[in-house]
């Protein structure tokens, strides 16, 4: 690309700007407020040590005292998952959000998710009430059994909308700022349903929309705000093969500072280049074999062009980087006050579809990801041989923490049966292969699908 083309690209007109809102959970306008840059909070390294914010909820156990469970500081000797001699919430197994153990033994509910207000990736605006009349987001909508966050973002980006909302695990809605102006925030824990197309992502809840800015995971953009966040294409899904994406970066100031919050490329053929926008000269290049520095990276240019290319086989989590403009190349690295992100949200030029389609599963980070799909299959197998001492009662399963394994109910992946008969019920451990097992639960209603959306709603439905 020639110098004139680079200059022209830098100064492309950009779409109307999204204004910051105090209600936003993790807006791209305020990246400094977020402690997480992955959609499931696997990168959370904060200090919340209770399941609720500001002292609410149950206290977490110390990770160096949980050897009886599947995850402890002993299982993370290199600190890859952030475990250690502390009791802060973490996500060592790639679950949908950080969690912690709350009980010494695996009797009853021995772990819980953590509600961490500061752990929402920039670009996620929060959980909103959707009563349906009128809808929380008034633009086009669709459903998909393979819905992921990025599938919905791509759909709404293609339609020309600023915001995308995921609901009930399978529904996607598009909208604009005016919709959120009359919207009503819901508790973050209300958006607790797993995306049908990705076991490691949450897609809203029953009557609850998880709302995102569509610029998240965009393949191109023109970024001129004093500071902000740029994600790899298709984020929070993995980037796909043969991606060729560019972002023009020109915040006010004489120099730039970049900090990579996440960087995971598949191999040396997947490459991110940083070029001076005026001259086109290559300043730095990173790939799967040559990652960027862990700390801030300063560049003596006021305008930058980032280009990412993946090969025909490329699939990995990608990258998330924060940037800020510096008034002087020697400026001390201190975040400016009151800065705001002003992303452009142009339509992706490639890999877009008129209807939601499946995204790729997230890449394994160390040993933390255990397939939820496999776990569900194991649980279904266990269901066939569960206890049947109580006639005409139903058994519903909720996963424990640990690698999937068949065997006794006290195994590392134990399951829990909810035996209930209206109007009351009780949670009991399932013991596969019980000789008293008997037939189906004729005459007793099953829990509704919405009541099975998470461990929390499953137990609270009793």
Curated annotation (Swiss-Prot):
Chief location of this protein within or outside the cell: membrane
Residues in compartment: Cytoplasmic: 388-462
SMART domains for this protein: CUB, KR, WSC
One GO molecular-function entry: transmembrane signaling receptor activity
Domain Kringle: 35-119
Residue numbers on the Extracellular membrane side: 26-364
Compartment list: Membrane
SS bonds (residue pairs): 36-119, 60-100, 89-114, 219-245
Gene Ontology annotations for the cellular component aspect, listed alphabetically: early endosome membrane; plasma membrane
Membrane topology qualifier: Single-pass type I membrane protein
This protein's UniProt keywords: Disulfide bond, Glycoprotein, Kringle, Membrane, Signal, Transmembrane, Transmembrane helix, Wnt signaling pathway
Region described as Disordered: 328-352
Keyword Cytoplasm carried by entry: no
Pfam families attached to this UniProt entry: CUB, Kringle, WSC
InterPro entries: CUB_dom (IPR000859), Kremen (IPR017076), Kremen_rcpt (IPR051836), Kringle (IPR000001), Kringle-like (IPR013806), Kringle_CS (IPR018056), Kringle_sf (IPR038178), Sperma_CUB_dom_sf (IPR035914)
Residue ranges of every copy of the CUB domain listed in the record: 219-326
Stretch forming the signal peptide: 1-25
Role played: Receptor for Dickkopf proteins. Cooperates with DKK1/2 to inhibit Wnt/beta-catenin signaling by promoting the endocytosis of Wnt receptors LRP5 and LRP6. Plays a role in limb development; attenuates Wnt signaling in the developing limb to allow normal limb patterning and can also negatively regulate bone formation.
Domain characteristics, as noted in the entry: Binding to ERLEC1 is mediated by the oligosaccharides linked to the kringle domain.
Complex formation: Interacts with ERLEC1. Forms a ternary complex with DKK1 and LRP6.
Protein name, entry field: Kremen protein 2
